[in-house]
Amino acid sequence: YIDAVPYRKNLSVRRLYSQYDFARKAEKILEKEQADMVYMILPANSLAAAGDRLKRKMNRTVLVFDILDLWPESLGGKKLQKLWPFQYWRRLRDDHLKAADLVITECHYFQKFINAKQEKTAVVYWPKEVPEGWKMEIPENEAPENQVPVPEPQTALGNAGVNTPAVIHFAYLGSINNIIDIDGIVNFLEITGKMTSVFLHVVGDGENRGLFEEKLKSRGIKAEFYGAVYEEAVKAEIFSRCMFGINMMKPGVCVGLTMKSIDYFCYGLPLVNNIPGDTWELVKQEQIGINYRPDAALKCAQELLELAQSDRLKEIKYKMQSLYMKLFAQEAAENVIRERVLPLLEGGPK
């Protein structure tokens, strides 16, 4: 283990120093190793600089960068991105990507923001293991395929028919931090709530929880906050009450896929989405929810209501779970590693 400098705030000088210190210590340890491959997960961006130096010192070592998040781009704020400290922070990553034999990104969308040759890039979506004890609900007109976890009691989706549900239950999963679009979520729920009753189930916690609760209450939106939930069975039971999963972040945040959306895919919750790139295209092409636009909020709410009234929800649930198995299950990630990473060990660095 490497001792790391502790920090409290998500965005702070102390956190940046902690990451710099970790990269420095990791580099010193790796200098003493005879490694066939160095696989570095970014951020911290300072690891990219360390990897570049190690690559030059360890000539025959294969270097792989795996970019799980773009910092500082994912923090949002166009004005912030132009400030010198943020430009320097970004260049800590970008100026050293050329040293890698392969650059893996968490989604295709990230590749628009990095300077890496296409033939030296690959996409590995963040995998989620199939939870034990759940199976895919197969529509009557579909042939059975791989087993996918869904709660057997379909209290929300299974009973959805051609009539408007008395209450539309939404799920929000994940951190309640400074980059989620609290105003967008609240506005959308308020508009939808004028057409039918709505209820929000919040699975997660964070520094903006109080603000989220206050804004929901001020608009008369009923909600229940469960805090952070780590038990898969508990999370599945909460999701079984919900009809849609909310996947919304502030405009300008550089994210193409969220971990919460992978859970929604796993449990077959159609998306209320404003995330660009990979997720936006999946929703659009596969018709697995609605892509929310603030300038067309009323139209989006009407589209959601039409979907809630339709008989397509079981079909969408099945489609989302099939996409989960194809794109986001552990096996999908392992296939990319076998096809793109392991051959580098056999042939050595390019």
Range-by-range predicted roles:
Residues 24-27, 46-49, 53-57, 83-103:
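Membrane-proximal helix-turn-helix segments that form the acceptor-binding/catalytic region
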Residues 142-147, 154-156, 161-180, 185-190, ...:
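Conserved donor-binding/catalytic core segment of Leloir-type glycosyltransferases
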Residues 72, 86-150, 223-225:
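Donor nucleotide-sugar binding/catalytic pocket of nucleotide-sugar-dependent glycosyltransferases
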Residues 17-18, 58-62, 73-95, 132:
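Nucleotide-sugar donor phosphate/pyrophosphate-binding loop at the beta->alpha transition
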Residues 180, 226, 231-237, 245-265, ...:
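Nucleotide-sugar-dependent
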